[in-house]
Amino acid sequence: MKNIILLLIAVTGLIFQGCSSANEEAKKVKIGICSDVHLPTMHDSEKRITAFIDSMKIAKPDFIIELGDFGIPKKEYLKYFDIWNSFPAPKYHVIGNHEMDGGTSMEKALTFREMKKSYYSFEMKGFRFIVLDGNDKQNSDEKGYRSYMGKKQLTWLRNELNSTNNPVVVFSHQGIGHDPGIPGERYSIANSKEVRKIFEEHNRKNKKARIICCFNGHTHHDYAEDINGIWYVTINSMSYYWLGEEYEHIRYSADVDKEFKWIKYTAPYRDPLFAVVEISTDGVIKIIGKSSEYVGPSPWELGYPEQLKKYVAPRISSRLLEFNKININ
């Protein structure tokens, strides 16, 4: 695997060297990204996180980020956070809906990650990165998992966008794009149209500080779509695709199945999935993904609805996405 990673790094370098020849002043940033590790679900989470961190130490991104549903704050998971924190460069978390499982409060989830707020921003390599939280309450009596960005957060978002002269990249757990689902289900946040309108209005008024792309997890899909000049990219889970109890299938030993009771309702990926993303203001988003295979039968062999077959797969696709070049001079 190490040789494959080194080859991909070399190829990426050649691509971006070609891009920069047209504009030596182009801004570039390199990101290591993963999503939906789901520590409580998988029996081999330590191996998966270690593989990601080891790969990132070779790839040397400017920072790493996980897009939520990492794990709840329990002592038995501290060792996984220690592995994450062993990466010798900046590292960031996004709060997913499962971070509050088991009655965990948002405050406790944040404290466990040494985070001050569930939404925040940072600057790196001439870009502004905005991390959003899709777990706001849509109404005061709302129960269960949430998928909404409230008024206070969106006011903060507008202020963040108005305060920068740098191109913008957005991260969230729940999606802001269309992210297709089974008919009757909605996978993006409830007010995704409202948030996209904020993005698009900002881009109409700003040429240098345009929003380039938004990355999310949550659905365990492999998906990318350009909506009105902004790329919305769903990063697949590091670990599995969730099927549900009606597709129960025991894929590991009896001991594993007994201790990790949710695995039988998933289609696990044999290898951990993650990606390296490189963004250049020359107008290129380069995603170097990974492919694996299912442990046991695929969702389709178990009768899972086939309308999602295009997006449900044991992979994060490698992609070359283009956007209008940003003139930073």
Where are the regions a protein language model picked out?
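Bacterial Sec-dependent N-terminal signal peptides
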Residues: 1-26, 203
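N-terminal active-site segment of His-dependent metallophosphoesterases
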Residues: 19-79
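Hydrophobic beta-strand anchors of alpha/beta hydrolase catalytic cores
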Residues: 31, 64, 129, 168-169
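Active-site glycine-centered loops adjacent to acidic/histidine catalytic or metal-binding residues
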Residues: 36, 68-69, 96-97, 173, ...
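Extended active-site neighborhood of metal-dependent phosphoesterases/phosphodiesterases
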Residues: 75-163, 191-211, 221, 225-236, ...
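Short, well-ordered beta-to-alpha junction loops that form the rim of enzyme active sites
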Residues: 134, 171-176, 217-219, 290-292
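Short acidic, glycine-rich surface-loop motifs adjacent to enzyme active sites
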Residues: 159-181
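A short C-terminal boundary segment appended to hydrolase-like catalytic domains
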Residues: 258-329
